[in-house]
Amino acid sequence: MFDGIGFMELLLIGVLGLVVLGPERLPVAVRSITSWIRAMKRMANSVKEELEQELKIEQLHADLKKAESKGLSNLSPELKESIEQLKQAAQSVNRPYQVQDPVKDTPAPENQIHSPVSSTVQTSQVHTSPAQASQANPTATVEASPTSASPATPSEPSQGADTRSNPKANG
């Protein structure tokens, strides 16, 4: 671990650490330094593993190119094995994700206490947007649509209008 550092150098570092940090803070400092070293080693190992994986993929890809150039009939067993591994990796990547069906996940109607409505009606109501609902039922109208509303302020006061707020009408 300490290739270039001998026993005397380690002893000198320990004494200097004891003098600078003191006996209370030295164990905490040693623990934090060792945790940093462990984290660095873990990071280096993960990078190393990723590089090895990438190199293996590159090797498999190169073997596949060789197999294509030679033809698939007269291949060595090593190339056939690498082709099979590559095919399996491609199939695992291309495998579609399985989506859970919300209808299958709902409890059976006899187990439901709060809702006498069937589960198909509930799911159709949940997954329908207002635009889709209006397209599905064109006869349905919205009560307060802005296009059919009358103007908010009348241009002329009506005969039964309240005259208390209008000073000209009072006088």
From Swiss-Prot:
| Region of interest called Disordered, as start-end residue ranges on this chain | 69-171
- Tell me, what does this protein do in biology? Part of the twin-arginine translocation (Tat) system that transports large folded proteins containing a characteristic twin-arginine motif in their signal peptide across membranes. Together with TatC, TatB is part of a receptor directly interacting with Tat signal peptides. TatB may form an oligomeric binding site that transiently accommodates folded Tat precursor proteins before their translocation.
Keyword set, alphabetical order: Cell inner membrane, Cell membrane, Membrane, Protein transport, Translocation, Transmembrane, Transmembrane helix, Transport
A GO cellular component term found in this entry reads: TAT protein transport complex
Q: Which residue windows does the record flag with biased composition (Low complexity)?
A: 114-130, 138-158
State whether it acts alone or in a complex, and with which partners, per the record: The Tat system comprises two distinct complexes: a TatABC complex, containing multiple copies of TatA, TatB and TatC subunits, and a separate TatA complex, containing only TatA subunits. Substrates initially bind to the TatABC complex, which probably triggers association of the separate TatA complex to form the active translocon.
Q: What is the name of the protein in this document? A: Sec-independent protein translocase protein TatB
Q: Which protein family is named in the record?
A: Belongs to the TatB family.
The Polar residues compositionally biased stretches are 88-97, 160-171
Checking Gene3D superfamilies in the record gives: 1.20.5.3310
Q: Which gene encodes it?
A: tatB
Q: Which domain of life is it from?
A: Bacteria
Q: Name one GO biological process term.
A: protein transport by the Tat complex
Q: Which residues cross the membrane?
A: 2-22
Q: Give compartment(s).
A: Cell inner membrane
Keyword Protein transport among record annotations: yes
Determine if Transport is one of this entry's keywords: yes
Molecular function, one GO term? protein transmembrane transporter activity
Q: State the Pfam families in the record.
A: TatA_B_E (PF02416)
Q: Mainly resides where?
A: membrane
> What membrane topology term does the record carry?
Single-pass membrane protein
